Amino acid sequence: MKILGLTGSIGMGKSTAAAMLRRLGVPVHDADATVHALFARGGKAVAAVDAAFPGVVRDGAVDRTALGAQVFGDGAALKRLEAIVHPLVRAAERDFLARHRRARTRLVVLDIPLLFETHGESRCDLVAVVSAPAFLQAARVLARPGMTRQRLDAVLAKQMPDGQKRRRADVVIPTGLGKGPALKRLKAVVAMMRGSRPAAPVGGDASKPPFY
């Protein structure tokens, strides 16, 4: 079974790329969705988060806004949260991979926002980085409810710069020109990893514009 790692900074279009891969028939393990499930009523992280951050659990689920207010700008608090969440996310990922190995699935995707930052590339056969011009990234993110420039800058400060991600990528997925070029590149990657076409040089180059 081949494993494609999918990552990209906030606002780059990673969720759209993951949805395209699902439509191409590739199973996707979404780390963010796993966190949402862990924080939901009955989720495996609720009790531990409640103990570490009193007052953030309401009606049996983690209130992400309240949690964010306690963690935002506090590096020590963030590390406490990560110590709770990351092992549970990895356990869910291992279950996903084991299930698809048993099913003899040929290709799966690990959708991980902080893939390089957490050294997740070591678990992947190939890493795809979703990228767009910085001005478009900012416009997308600032259009989200409750998002401010300060919050965006804080998120970006915790993420590897886009140029560095592209330099480390095996393939760059462009989203700056719309869905068409992104889908074309993803189809080529899927075909290559499934073995239905020869390998081709599809890597990124940080010295070039990210597919404007």
UniProtKB/Swiss-Prot annotation:
One of the record's GO molecular function terms: ATP binding
EC number: 2.7.1.24
Keywords: ATP-binding, Coenzyme A biosynthesis, Cytoplasm, Kinase, Nucleotide-binding, Transferase
Main location: cytoplasm
Protein's UniProt keywords contain ATP-binding: yes
Keyword Ribosomal protein applies: no
CDD domains in alphabetical order: DPCK (cd02022)
Gene Ontology biological process terms, A to Z: coenzyme A biosynthetic process
Pfam hit, one: CoaE
Domain (DPCK): residue spans on this chain: 3-204
Compartment list: Cytoplasm
Pathway membership: Cofactor biosynthesis; coenzyme A biosynthesis; CoA from (R)-pantothenate: step 5/5
Reaction(s) catalysed by this chain's protein: 3'-dephospho-CoA + ATP = ADP + CoA + H(+)
Recorded superkingdom: Bacteria
Annotated positions binding ATP: 11-16
Uppermost EC category: transferase
Entry GO terms, CC: cytoplasm
Listed PANTHER family: BIFUNCTIONAL COENZYME A SYNTHASE-RELATED (PTHR10695:SF46), DEPHOSPHO-COA KINASE-RELATED (PTHR10695)
Family in the record: Belongs to the CoaE family.
Role played: Catalyzes the phosphorylation of the 3'-hydroxyl group of dephosphocoenzyme A to form coenzyme A.
Protein name: Dephospho-CoA kinase
Record gene name: coaE
